Every structure is written in C-alpha cells, then in structure tokens.
C-alpha cells in the first residue's frame, strides 16, 4: 500500500500543465509577415483523432503565450462572450485549415532561432456520443528572429 501511495504522489508531483487531448492533435508554426507592414501569426492546426470529433468555431480557439515570453507579443482581439452553445446549430472548424493567431516579434527579442511555448484552448464535441469538452494543450514552435 505504501508503494502505491508513493507512486501516486510522484505522478501528481510530476504532472505540470494539462495533459494532451486524446481526441485532438495540435501542431503550431510561426508564419512571418509576407511583406513589410504585414502581420505575423501563429498557425495552429487542430486535427481530430476520431472522425466523429469536431472542433467548435464558437467559442473560438485562443492562444496564450507564456507570461514572460521574450520573443512574441500577442495581438489577438480580446475574447468575446459567446451566446449559449446550441449543439444542433453548431459550426465546426475545417480540420484541413489552420487557425491563425496574430502576433508580433518584440523589438527586444534575442536574435536567432528561438523556441516559443504557448497554450491553446478550444472546445470540441462528439455528435455520435453526445458530449462536448474544453481542450487545453501546450504547443511549441520555432521563431527565427533576424
């Protein structure tokens, strides 16, 4: 019994942040501005692992950079309040298209290739099984600061 409690304590202490979703796989990449004056963004692809699972358009997915992020600054508009969720009229994201989150490179960002960490929050549903859940996953991507 003591070994089981010690093992459980180690598992709890070792857990830092959310565990990845078993229903949706995420990947992220930094997309620099296409031309001078244009905006940079982080493109996040949310790929359901089960054909029945869909990622909701509303409430819209959100990207949150780490508080002490030295490379990027978030340029997203503030989150808006959504009306109550209606599963019968829900709209879903196309899994083939990434969601774009506007960002800018900080003028004080260190030069060279930098790894940026962020957290993505989204909502997804299974129509067949009749449930909806909130997903929160960590992503990492490279930014080449010139």
Segments from the language model and where they lie:
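Bacterial N-terminal signal peptides
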Residues: 2-14
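Extracellular/lumen-exposed scaffold segments
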Residues: 16-146
């Amino acid at each position: 019994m003591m070994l089981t409690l010690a093992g459980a304590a180690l598992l709890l202490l070792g857990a830092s942040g959310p565990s990845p979703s078993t229903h949706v796989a995420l990947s992220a990449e930094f997309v620099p501005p296409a031309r001078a004056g244009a905006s940079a963004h982080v493109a996040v692809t949310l790929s359901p692992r089960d054909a029945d699972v869909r990622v909701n358009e509303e409430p819209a997915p959100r990207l949150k950079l780490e508080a002490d992020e030295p490379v990027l600054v978030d340029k997203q508009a503030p989150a808006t309040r959504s009306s109550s969720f209606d599963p019968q009229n829900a709209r879903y994201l196309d899994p083939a298209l990434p969601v774009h989150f506007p960002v800018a490179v900080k003028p004080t960002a260190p030069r060279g290739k930098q790894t940026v960490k962020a957290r993505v929050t989204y909502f997804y549903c299974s129509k067949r099984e009749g449930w909806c859940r909130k997903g929160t996953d960590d992503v990492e991507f490279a930014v080449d600061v010139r």
